[in-house]
Structure formats: structure tokens, C-alpha cells
């Protein structure tokens, strides 16, 4: 039990109470301006709380402008942080602003295993600028023009042709919406489909930010277990029948965080179950092009003839994150409702980024780059797997994507391991963040795509030492 919080308190709010206690102590002058705050370990021991709780409290201080981080040194108070106006401003505690994954990813560390993003050196930086110039040459008025809310017609037409050729998707450009990234697409879908207390099926484990979005609209999440072989379809059918969900959010291709891929046979059956129970399937497909040997099966949308699949295809992670481009394929009336929500959200994704993406993605040069990128990521995955072997961990080898879903040795908890890792400039994603039941404290997600090859080897050696210290 924390020394500063009653035992009846909600555990999820404990870090906020710690933050409030720190603010009071700052106000009392216990720490001087620009002075160093106690280390995460020291304050956790003093207060009788977990180190991860103190880490989250320090992150709140940082976000509110009262503290800053020095790399490999710790947290320091900012000048002026003791002013009455600042200390009187309470931390904002709304659910929407709680994002544990974002908190972890913002920590400046040397060994960054929490980011399912590409090492910037793997992106097509050398010739991206050429396509930016080409966009201005071909569309000189691009900055003086709003894009249509649904997206640039030229891009939507090219995307419809691409999806038809690559994945056998039968759709028109009118059934596509261009969004500013996949996360906006998820938010628009939740906004148009959900009302408080609606049930939503989600994979267990799943993408943590998606759960945050759905919960922010009042959804009640029901977990569907995903395994290396896919889903227990009897469980899916039972939950669809009993919970009558508004939709089932799933990630069947190089699943985040597990890396699993659902077979074509199961995809067909999932679409049949969706039609049988009148449940929309929301398919999130961020890694379709990141395969190491054979391409994955076609998206669920390819098997849908009755409008029970909304397909989100994103490209930002491996093309150019700054472009923030995704496409949503859906039938009527879903696409019409999304269009209305998009018009209220931002009235259209910027035309310039759409034109740059159009020129870049469909070029022969980009397709050659993707072939090299798959090889580079496969090499990095192998490096991480080799480094992880022999230290008591287990995982299922993925056939693509950016992550390993790793089971820790018996008795080792992900939260404790992360707290130690942060102290040693290493981060990863604890399994609890990916679990709708907030369990999986014996699992971690390690991303092999952001760190370079030397950092992968050195970081895993450091991780092995941390594991030994907790064994």
C-alpha cells in the first residue's frame, strides 16, 4: 500500500496521486529550482510504490512543464516551476489524455525497443525530396487548394486499382476515404459507430491505442484470444451472439503485438460469422507489405460481399511517417458516415501530402525500396532473435511485421523489468498495455525495427542482465 494514497484508491490513478504529492513538496520548497529530483528508484522506495508508478508521475510533471529530462541523468525541475500559478494548476486527469504507450515512447533512451517504427535510416530519404519537388512541379497550386474531404480523386483512383490488382479487392474510388493516418481512421469509425456502453470485440492482446480510442467513446471491450494459429472461431461466434458488438476490431496480418497471421480459411469464416451476426469487422492492416518470405493472405475485405468489413490500410510507418496517409475501404452506409465525420474532424487530409504519396508509393523506385526494406528488417529480426536465445525467453517467430511478442521467465514481471530498463536507458512495451484485461504481465513486446543492428545486440545484452537481476 502506498504511503501517500489510501488502499481504497483506484490503482490506475496511483501515479496521479504521486504526482500531486510531488507538486505539494515542490511548493513546500523541498527541492530547489533547476534542482535534480530523486531518481525513480529512490522515490519509489521512499513512497512505497512501484517504480513504474513514479515514472508515470514524472511524465505528468514533464507534460505539465514543471520538469525536464536530461539524457542518462534524470529528471530536473524547470525554472519557474515553483510559481503559484503553475503549482496551482492541477494535472488533467481525463481518460483521453492517459496514454501509457506514448508515455513510454517519449522517454529519451539509447535502446528503443518500444517503437514499432522504422529506423529513419531505413526510409527512402535520399529520393523523397525529389518527389516533393515533383509534386510542386506537377501541381504548382497545391498549397493554395483544399483537398476534397474524401481525398484526392487521383489518389483514390490509383489506390482502388492497386488494391484490386494486389489483393483482389472489388471496390470503387467512391468506397475509399483518405485519412491522416490509421489512428484518425479508428477515431472516425469509433465516433460514427459507438455510443456509451456499446460492446466492441478486440483481439487479446491488441494495439493499446485502439483500446484507448474505443474506451474514450464509452465502449465496453470484450476480449477475443488470438493464437499462433489464429482465432478460436467458436469463441468468436459465442461473443458475437452474446455481446452483440457494434464491431470487432482485429489485426489479422502480422498482428500487433504478436506477429501472428490468420489463415485465408479463417478469414473467410470470420466474414461469414460477421454476416451471420450482423457484426462489422474493422480490419487494421499496417504491415501488409512487411513480409519476409511469402506475401500474407488477402485482407478480409477481399472475402466480403455484403458490406461487413471496414478495411484500414496504412502506409506511414514504412513509407514516410511525416506524410500520415491511410486509406479506409468501406461500403455504404459506413463510408458515408465516415465522410461526414471526416468533414467535421479536419475537412480533408492536406492535398500536398496526398500528392507526394501518390508520386512516391506507386513508383517503381518505391517498390524496389520495399524489397530491400524487407531484407533489412528480416536481418534485424534475426539479430534480435539470436541475441535473445538462451536467456530463458520464448516467442513465436513472425513471418513479417516489426515486433516480437516475448514470454518472460517465470516470476519476472514486465512492469518491474521496464522500471529497471528505463534506469538503464532501455524501453519496451509491457504486455499489460496490450491486454484489454490489463494482465499479461509476463509478456513484453520488443520492436526490432527502430534500433540499429549494434543497438539491438547491445540492448538485448543489457536486457539479459536485467533479467538475471530479477530472477
Regions found by a protein language model. Name each.
Residues 143-277, 289-290, 295-306:
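Conserved core of the PLP fold type I
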Residues 305-375:
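Conserved core segment of the aminotransferase class I/II
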Amino acid at each position: 500500500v502506498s504511503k501517500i494514497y489510501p488502499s481504497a484508491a483506484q490503482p490506475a490513478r496511483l501515479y496521479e496521486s504521486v504526482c500531486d504529492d510531488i507538486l505539494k513538496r515542490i511548493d513546500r520548497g523541498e527541492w530547489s529550482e533547476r534542482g535534480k529530483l530523486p531518481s525513480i528508484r529512490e522515490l519509489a522506495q521512499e513512497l512505497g510504490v512501484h517504480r513504474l508508478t513514479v515514472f508515470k508521475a514524472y511524465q505528468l510533471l514533464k507534460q505539465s512543464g514543471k520538469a525536464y529530462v536530461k539524457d542518462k541523468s534524470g529528471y530536473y525541475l524547470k525554472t519557474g516551476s515553483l510559481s503559484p500559478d503553475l503549482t496551482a494548476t492541477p494535472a488533467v486527469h481525463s481518460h483521453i489524455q492517459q496514454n501509457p504507450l506514448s508515455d513510454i515512447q517519449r522517454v529519451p533512451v539509447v535502446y528503443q525497443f518500444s517503437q514499432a517504427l522504422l529506423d529513419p535510416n531505413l526510409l527512402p530519404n535520399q529520393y523523397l525530396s525529389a518527389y516533393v519537388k515533383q509534386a510542386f512541379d506537377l501541381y504548382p497550386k497545391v498549397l493554395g487548394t483544399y483537398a476534397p474531404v474524401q481525398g484526392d480523386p487521383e489518389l483514390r483512383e490509383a489506390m482502388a486499382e492497386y488494391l484490386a490488382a494486389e489483393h483482389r479487392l472489388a471496390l470503387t474510388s467512391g468506397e475509399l476515404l483518405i485519412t491522416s493516418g490509421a489512428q484518425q481512421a479508428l477515431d472516425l469509425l469509433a465516433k460514427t459507430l459507438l455510443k456509451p456502453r456499446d460492446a466492441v470485440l478486440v483481439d487479446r492482446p491488441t494495439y493499446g491505442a485502439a483500446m484507448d480510442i474505443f474506451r474514450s467513446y464509452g465502449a465496453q471491450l470484450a476480449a477475443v484470444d488470438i493464437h499462433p494459429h489464429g482465432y478460436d472461431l467458436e469463441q468468436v461466434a459465442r461473443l458475437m451472439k452474446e455481446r452483440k458488438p457494434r464491431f470487432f476490431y482485429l489485426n489479422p496480418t502480422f498482428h500487433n503485438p504478436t506477429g501472428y497471421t490468420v489463415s485465408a480459411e479463417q478469414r473467410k469464416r470470420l466474414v461469414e460469422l460477421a454476416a451471420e451476426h450482423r457484426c462489422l469487422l474493422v480490419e487494421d492492416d499496417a504491415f501488409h507489405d512487411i513480409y519476409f518470405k511469402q506475401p500474407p493472405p488477402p485482407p478480409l475485405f477481399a472475402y466480403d460481399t455484403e458490406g461487413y468489413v471496414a478495411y484500414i490500410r496504412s502506409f506511414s510507418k514504412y513509407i514516410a511517417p511525416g506524410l500520415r496517409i491511410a486509406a479506409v475501404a468501406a461500403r455504404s452506409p459506413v463510408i458515408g458516415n465516415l465522410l461526414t465525420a471526416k468533414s467535421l474532424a479536419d475537412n480533408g487530409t492536406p492535398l500536398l501530402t496526398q500528392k507526394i504519396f501518390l508520386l512516391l508509393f506507386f513508383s517503381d523506385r518505391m517498390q524496389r525500396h520495399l524489397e530491400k526494406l524487407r531484407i533489412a528488417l528480416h536481418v534485424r529480426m534475426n539479430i534480435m532473435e539470436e541475441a535473445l536465445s538462451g536467456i530463458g525467453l520464448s516467442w513465436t517467430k513472425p513471418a513479417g511485421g516489426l515486433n516480437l511478442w516475448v514470454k518472460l521467465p517465470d516470476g519476472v514481471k514486465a512492469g518491474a523489468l521496464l522500471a529497471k530498463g528505463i534506469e538503464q536507458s532501455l524501453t519496451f512495451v509491457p504486455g499489460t498495455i496490450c491486454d484489454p484485461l490489463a494482465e499479461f504481465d509476463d509478456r513484453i513486446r520488443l520492436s526490432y525495427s527502430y534500433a540499429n543492428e549494434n543497438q539491438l545486440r547491445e540492448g538485448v545484452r543489457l536486457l539479459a542482465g536485467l533479467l538475471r537481476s530479477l530472477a
